[in-house]
């Protein structure tokens, strides 16, 4: 998949060049690159990728660009020479086709689930705005507080990315497996991805905590909150009434219902 990377910007980001530089090298290749300065990662990906093509029998690669609905938008076969010249063009295309939250900012962003099946970082910072290295990357929504409610089943207890939130739940904490979570952090050196935020007993308390801890909110009585299922599927989202005027003013947003109360169960959870 050719797409924006979660940790750096450059001519080659996530894609074939990075797959040769890191993927084919497996953990050894990943450690070699990640244990050097993050500020030159974009240079290392190209340097390592070119070295692989010069010294290994690479026949070519299949580049896939996805659309905003997590579907295949384009499939293109590339020769080694074309990887060098065409992948940067596909990278530019991916910036146009990927999903975006159609708001610049909110007080609280609620993410139902994170997981490696959604993003290498658990949640895609190009959506959430929570980058591992914000000094090298920007984008996504600007949320004062982020709440993560749960892990996906497919991530098998790997809670990488939990450290990018301020609040989580006991449900997620109980599913977290350190032996699945920590190795990735040791490899990529981004140990703060694995830090554990404040843990609340249920979803209701997690949302309440985040909402009462937003001193920069424009209107403390009408907070701006967005809830998404995960960062890979944001075609249908929930917003608070505080964001309704912004949504109505955007021709690219369709309002699907009248305002309603969040449906917490008897345990205070949303699902």
Language-model segments: residues:
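Conserved, well-structured core segments that form the ligand-binding/active-site neighborhood
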Residues: 2-115
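Surface-exposed beta-strand edges and their flanking turn/coil or helix-capping segments
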Residues: 31-34, 74-77, 123-125, 160-163, ...
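Elongated scaffolding segments in large macromolecular assemblies
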Residues: 64, 80-81, 124-127, 148
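Hydrophobic alpha-helical signal-anchor/transmembrane segments
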Residues: 112-113, 128-130
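Hard-cation-handling environments
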Residues: 119
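C-terminal non-catalytic interaction/assembly regions of soluble proteins
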Residues: 129-271
């Amino acid at each position: 998949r050719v797409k924006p990377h979660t940790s750096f910007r450059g001519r080659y980001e996530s894609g074939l060049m990075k797959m040769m530089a890191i993927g084919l090298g497996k953990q050894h290749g990943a450690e070699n690159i990640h244990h050097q300065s993050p500020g030159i990662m974009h240079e290392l990906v190209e340097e390592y990728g070119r070295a692989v093509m010069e010294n290994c029998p690479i026949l070519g690669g299949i580049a896939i660009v996805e659309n905003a609905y997590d579907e295949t938008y384009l499939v293109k076969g590339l020769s080694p020479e074309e990887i060098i010249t065409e992948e940067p063009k596909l990278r530019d295309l991916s910036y146009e086709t990927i999903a975006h939250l159609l708001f610049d900012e909110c007080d609280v962003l609620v993410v139902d689930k994170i997981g490696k099946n959604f993003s290498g970082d658990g949640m895609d910072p190009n959506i959430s705005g929570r980058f591992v290295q914000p000094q090298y990357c920007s984008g996504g929504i600007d949320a004062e507080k982020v709440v993560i409610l749960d892990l996906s089943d497919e991530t098998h207890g790997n809670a990488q990315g939990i450290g990018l939130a301020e609040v989580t739940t006991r449900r997620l904490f109980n599913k977290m497996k350190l032996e699945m979570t920590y190795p990735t952090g040791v490899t990529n050196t981004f140990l703060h991805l694995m830090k554990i935020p404040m843990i609340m007993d249920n979803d209701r308390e997690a949302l309440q905590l985040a909402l009462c801890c937003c001193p920069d909110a424009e209107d403390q009585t009408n907070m701006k909150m967005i809830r998404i299922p995960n960062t890979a599927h944001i075609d249908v989202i929930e917003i608070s009434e505080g964001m309704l005027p912004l949504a109505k003013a955007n021709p690219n947003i369709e309002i699907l219902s009248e305002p309603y109360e969040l449906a917490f169960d008897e345990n205070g959870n949303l699902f």
